[in-house]
Amino acid sequence: MKMTGKKIISAALLIVFAGLLFAESEDEMKKRILKNADLSGESASDLMAADDGEDKYANSKNAPKRLPSEFPRDVPYTKAGIDFCEAHYGHKIFNEEGRKRYYEASVKAAEEMTDEYSKLITLARADYYYGLSIMESFDLTSLDNMDLGDTKTTESINDRAGAYFDKAIDECNQALKIKKGSDGYSTLAQAISMNCTAKNVSYVLANGLKVRANAKKAVALDYSNGLGQFMVIAQDAYAPWPFCKLKSSRKALLRVLDDKYIRIERFDYQMIYAAIGYTFYKQKKWDKAIEWYNKILELYPQNFAARQMIKKIQDRKAGKKN
């Protein structure tokens, strides 16, 4: 079997991490990674304490609860932005020309805005979805992405996508200097999260903890921010062992789906469904996993990631290696 560069690196990383797991306890590993992480002012001890139990998801309990219709988001999606999201998740972008067409329309809509904060966040969304379209993959950390070697994420694709995620992060940081807004923090969390897929392990160790930290800020400002709520929880669903918390993260995601005070866009639903499906996948509960990935196909019948995961699960049920 021919080994690609990515698979060789992944195999080497698995060996390294396996050695570390035998050499130290879970708490010791967490402390080591927190020590090496760039937390940008976040307290490592606070993050360690918040990492146990479901209370870490209750970061927004003091935020005002209002129905989404009564509390509009600080940067509404433009029509062009929604079209880009829908085209990506609906698998309607088949080539670079189509990708650029949606991207340029989104950028044009942003440049027509007079409010600088809104303009920057809208540009960040355009850059994020451009990078995401290039990768056509799940929101997984680079470490956990090791077992998805059949995805289209080659090193060259990662580099291209990562440049757009970098751009989105810069735009969010510029916007947040103007205004501490909920959509700014949730968009930043989302961009960092996908950059953890595109970049190397050192990037994950330095920046991974910023995802939840920024998502918590988003939800503290606007409890109804569905993306923010999702990003607070998502790392526990997608993180590699021993950091994943499959049952508690799934319970928290189901709670988000049931909360009438949380605004969930159509394209946010597919992210939540995918994360719930992934928790069942990691537990080898194949039928339950397929059930949730099928929910994505009810929204987006041609969704690439859901179809890919269903095929992967069906192959594993049949005893095939993939």
Descriptions of predicted regions:
Residues 2-10:
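Bacterial N-terminal signal peptides that target proteins for export
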Residues 183, 226-227, 259-268, 299-310:
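Boundary/linker segments of alpha-helical solenoid repeat arrays
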